[in-house]
Amino acid sequence: MQHNLIAFLSDVGSADEAHALCKGVMYGVAPAATIVDITHDVAPFDVREGALFLADVPHSFPAHTVICAYVYPETGTATHTIAVRNEKGQLLVGPNNGLLSFALDASPAVECHEVLSPDVMNQPVTPTWYGKDIVAACAAHLAAGTDLAAVGPRIDPKQIVRLPYASASEVEGGIRGEVVRIDRAFGNVWTNIPTHLIGSMLQDGERLEVKIEALSDTVLELPFCKTFGEVDEGQPLLYLNSRGRLALGLNQSNFIEKWPVVPGDSITVSPRVPDSNLGPVLG
């Protein structure tokens, strides 16, 4: 299979030329490739955020994709770049620091190699920019038809560094989860609470209690809605995001500006106390 589509993620930002130079290296190796930007605005050095941004990429991109990703605070050290084939047939290239964790949860690794061959690197390799000279260059060589086995020695997929992912769980009277991501563009809060765990509570218009421990155990009483327009402008709601997880938002406004939670904060969702006459904020 010819992998002539490259999906590219990094933490270098879009304010200067860094991501364009990486693309220049890739086009120099694979001029027929198409390069799609996932994002270059991962928070600097934030491997977990980068991993979360990659989580849905395997589902959304076709099998002939090379997923090229780097958030590489260890650049120039013994942390190696790896190249992986997943069950879907896609190829992934990135540092072995956990960045590929959630993408590989979506489509597990079936073959993995350390990228050690100088033939698939941009020479001379800059120790402070493995992302360009090793990750991007290797991804381009794979897109140009280089065999995966040619990049370096095969390793057991069990050697791929994986980030821990806290699962939501049932607790007395409700479901306990945590904030995993902030939708920066709109200020919505995404949790790790999946549909199957909370489905019995999710009746359209049903009001649920949401306890946010980091905000002095603030409790919100929020309606569950299928979409934002079911509440008035500026009003809070619960909804299922496009990834099938429970999320909190404000219609046409910014949830975290009003309730400033961050990833890792605990959230407990439970059925509304019957006959409660309290407003949206209970505590």
Curated annotation (Swiss-Prot):
Record keywords, A-Z: Chloride, S-adenosyl-L-methionine, Transferase
Claim: S-adenosyl-L-methionine is one of the keywords in the record: yes
SUPFAM superfamilies: Bacterial fluorinating enzyme, C-terminal domain, Bacterial fluorinating enzyme, N-terminal domain
Effect recorded for Y70T: Results in a 2-fold reduction of chlorinase activity
Residues that coordinate or bind substrate: D11, Y70, V71, Y72, T128, W129, Y130, G131
A Gene Ontology molecular function term of the record: transferase activity, transferring alkyl or aryl (other than methyl) groups
Reactions listed under catalytic activity: chloride + S-adenosyl-L-methionine = 5'-chloro-5'-deoxyadenosine + L-methionine
Protein residues bound to chloride: G131
Effect of a null allele: Cells lacking this gene are not able to produce salinosporamide A (SalA), however they produce salinosporamide B.
Subunit structure of this chain's protein: Homotrimer.
Primary role: Involved in the biosynthesis of the proteosome inhibitor salinosporamide A (SalA). Catalyzes the halogenation of S-adenosyl-L-methionine (SAM) with chloride to generate 5'-chloro-5'-deoxyadenosine (5'-CIDA) and L-methionine. It can also use bromide and iodide, producing halogenated 5'-deoxyadenosine (5'-XDA) and L-methionine, however no halogenase activity is detected in the presence of fluoride.
Protein name: Adenosyl-chloride synthase
Organism: Salinispora tropica (strain ATCC BAA-916 / DSM 44818 / JCM 13857 / NBRC 105044 / CNB-440)
